């Protein structure tokens, strides 16, 4: 094109058409009343609709937004001030659709005529759904590594795990530990035998609302073999399971089935707590009616969190066993009570300091028999 040539209106329109239709980011044009004039979104689930049915409608009539009030305030602010908004995270789902939510980074600019008349808004929508999921999983795993295993107590370690997984990964998290492990005994080898009992060590739910519990914390029982819980401990493989009202294996555990249905749980992950071919316990994660189902990335995170926790549980188990042995030896090493009555008797016992500081043996005076 020669330097003195100009683009015709038709060519100018064609260039804009190509830019709009082939933009790598989603584009949305709204009028001053926030009604949709044109749309080009990269997610098929968001634009696979009849354009004739959405053009001219308010954006909140077409899409469910995670925070519609905040979005409305942002758009109104750009219309009034002309100052663009950059990088607002907005969760979007087609109106009334049961599918997953998508997360967009939204930047908005005001459209004006050469004379300054406001035409509307241009919204650029970058799909960051997968990026944010990965970032969230990395954050949760970092928290598990930092906060799980701070004590040498099996049950406390399990409680630390479920607190870090809810609500960032799951709506409900349950940890069950082989009962012998809680007492400091050696964990059984895999595959776990059907009759081996597990103790429900920790449960955490999002929202804190009261829900039906399959079994209370502290309950000890074996797992029905036909369930994915028992199968996970048999082959030490994680499972991602869809849950529904007619899921056949729920009949093998009626109380657990009742709790699952009451919570509206529709997605389940089961992961073994295992170390060096032995079985320490089981991690179960649930998502309920308020959230999307689990993905393979969530399974990967759960496996990594379970591996770290299994090591911490085994350390706590070893400490429990050694502490029990030390107390037993200490009791047997106490001096026998002297047969001769005395005015004051002393009993010697070494009491370890809870603060980790050195503590000596302190004689404890006891009253002597008789009138003295």
Cite the ranges covered by each PLM segment:
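Sensory coupling linkers of modular signal transduction proteins
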Residues: 2-10, 111-148
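Sensory modules in modular signal-transduction proteins
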Residues: 7-48, 157
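Short hydrophobic secondary-structure edge segments in sensory/regulatory modules of signaling proteins
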Residues: 27, 173-175, 268
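GAF sensory/regulatory domain recognition
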Residues: 44, 52, 163, 176-221
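Regulatory sensory and allosteric helical modules in signal-transduction proteins
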Residues: 52-64, 73-89, 201-261
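… and, occasionally, acidic/histidine-rich disordered N-termini of signaling adaptors
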Residues: 95-99, 119, 187-188, 320-372
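Sensory beta-strand/linker motifs that couple input domains to effectors
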Residues: 121-124, 271, 277-287
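Short hydrophobic beta-strand micro-motif common in sensory/regulatory domains
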Residues: 256-259, 264-274
């Amino acid at each position: 094109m020669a330097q003195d040539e100009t683009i015709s209106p038709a060519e100018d329109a064609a260039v804009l058409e190509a830019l709009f239709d082939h933009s790598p980011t989603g584009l949305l044009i709204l009028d001053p009343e926030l009604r949709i004039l044109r749309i080009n979104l990269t997610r098929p689930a968001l634009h696979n609709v009849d354009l004739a049915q959405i053009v001219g409608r308010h954006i909140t009539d077409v899409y469910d937004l995670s925070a519609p009030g905040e979005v409305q305030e942002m758009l109104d602010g750009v219309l009034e001030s002309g100052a663009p908004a950059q990088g607002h995270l907005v969760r979007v789902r087609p109106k009334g659709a049961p599918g997953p939510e998508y997360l967009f980074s939204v930047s908005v600019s005001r459209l004006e005529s050469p004379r300054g008349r406001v035409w509307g808004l241009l919204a650029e929508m970058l799909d960051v759904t997968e990026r944010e999921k990965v970032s969230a999983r990395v954050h949760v795993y970092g928290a598990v590594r930092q906060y799980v295993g701070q004590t040498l107590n099996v049950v406390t370690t399990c409680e630390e795990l479920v607190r870090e997984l809810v609500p960032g990964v799951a709506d409900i998290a349950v940890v069950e530990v082989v009962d012998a492990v809680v007492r400091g005994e050696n964990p059984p080898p895999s595959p776990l035998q059907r009759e081996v009992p597990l103790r429900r060590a920790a449960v955490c739910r999002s929202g804190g609302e009261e829900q039906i519990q399959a079994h209370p914390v502290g309950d000890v029982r074996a797992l029905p073999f036909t369930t994915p819980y028992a199968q996970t401990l048999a082959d030490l493989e994680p499972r991602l399971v869809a849950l529904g009202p007619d899921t056949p294996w729920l009949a093998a555990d009626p109380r657990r089935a009742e709790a699952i249905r009451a919570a509206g749980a529709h997605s389940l992950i089961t992961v073994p707590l295992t170390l060096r071919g032995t079985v320490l316990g089981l991690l179960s994660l649930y998502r309920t009616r308020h959230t999307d189902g689990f993905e393979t990335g969530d399974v990967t995170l759960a496996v990594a969190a379970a591996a770290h926790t299994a090591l911490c549980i085994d350390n706590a188990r070893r400490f429990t066993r050694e502490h029990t042995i030390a107390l037993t030896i200490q009791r047997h090493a106490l001096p026998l009570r002297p047969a001769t009555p005395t005015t004051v008797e002393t009993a010697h016992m070494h009491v370890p300091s809870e603060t980790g500081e050195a503590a000596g043996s302190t004689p404890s005076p006891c009253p002597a028999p008789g009138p003295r």
